[in-house]
Amino acid sequence: MKENELKGKVAVVTGSSRGIGRGIAVGLGEKGATVYITGRSKGNGPLTIDETAKMVNEAGGVGVPVSVDLGDDEQIMRLYQQIESDHGRLDIHVNNAFKIPNPPVWGGKFWEHPIQVWDDQVGIGLRAAY
């Protein structure tokens, strides 16, 4: 991709306060996109949506931090209504959010994990983007 190839494009990256989501958001910013940074981690600190938005801005894009719990349908609707109100469209959607179970249930036999773990993952990973 060329520099500023995404200038004028509007993106949302779910779960972008850290890790892969942060990397994707910054990469979109490097190409000039306006990127809605979503997550539950708002405020000061290295692993927050505010810090990711700052990184997107420094990369040449426009970072917009939005605190949203993707397990809450009303918060999801407010996010997309805000994007529509601000821009009238959404060009790029990256569904990256993931909920780490508390307590973590890594390893073992998947069929022995509580069904709530599955429901949470489907709710955040699939349903929230719908």
Q: How would you label these PLM feature ranges?
A:
Residues 77, 99-119:
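Conserved mid-core segment of classical short-chain dehydrogenase/reductases
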Residues 59-62, 82-95, 101, 114-117:
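A glycine-rich helix->loop->beta "capping" turn
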Residues 47, 67-80, 115:
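The beta1-alpha1 cofactor-binding region of Rossmann-like NAD(H)/NADP(H)-dependent oxidoreductases
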